[in-house]
Regions:
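Hydrophobic alpha-helical segments at protein termini of multi-pass membrane proteins
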Residues: 1-209
Length: 209
């Protein structure tokens, strides 16, 4: 049995100490890191509870329950940040990415502790694939919210649409992982390629401007 709350305490404690020492400018980054790991912890409990209540098998829990729960949980601290602090548009995407990458980091650490780290190639691909998938979902949601929350009439509909897009991407990723075989490695490579393609496109647009 893996006591993930103990893992959370061990990982969050240094971040909290660093947040107190680094000053107000860097405080937001560390708080978003802790929030990302915290919602990952809560997502694990909620996934387990819903899987038990719905009597879902492993495939249903992975492809149907987990994407919805995890993407909604990642959205909660971001929506709180938007409602309470009303940040400028250029601060929304970094916040979403920070939450996503800390979520992925905590998830990978828990996976390593539970399943071992003896298969380097598999862990290597999983680390990059899972991290890129969560960051890609964060880019979709964060980049979209930076646009929609500047327009009052788009806030609710835009947020729901972006959440749906992130859930769909997450579900496809998990479904390919659950299928196993070559599809599993395709799913690990796909988010990395999409992030790389998006970055290259952004660089080209910047050079043209």
């Amino acid at each position: 049995m893996t006591y993930i709350e103990n893992i959370f305490l061990c990982m969050a404690s240094p971040l909290l100490v660093a947040a107190l020492c680094m000053g107000r400018r860097q405080l937001r980054f560390f708080l978003f890191c802790i929030a990302g790991m915290g919602v990952c912890l809560l997502s694990a409990y909620i996934n387990t509870f819903l899987a038990a209540v719905c009597q879902a098998d492993a495939l249903a829990a992975t492809a149907e329950i987990a994407p919805v729960v995890e993407e909604m949980m990642k959205l909660l601290p971001l929506v709180f940040y938007l409602l309470v602090f009303e940040p400028e548009g250029d601060k929304i995407k970094p916040a979403a990415i920070t939450i996503a990458l800390s979520f992925a980091t905590f998830e990978n650490v828990c996976y390593l502790i539970q399943n071992g780290a003896d298969r380097f190639s598999f862990i290597f691909f999983r680390g990059f694939g899972t991290g890129a998938m969560h960051v890609l979902c964060g880019l979709i949601v964060g980049g979209g919210l930076a646009y929609t929350w500047q327009r009052t009439w788009l806030k609710i509909a835009g947020t729901c649409g972006l959440l749906g897009a992130a859930i769909t991407l997450h579900a496809i990723y998990n479904l390919l992982i659950a299928h196993g075989g070559a599809a599993q490695y395709v799913s690990y490579a796909l988010p990395v390629l999409l992030v790389a393609a998006g970055k290259l496109s952004a660089l080209r647009l910047t050079r043209r401007e």
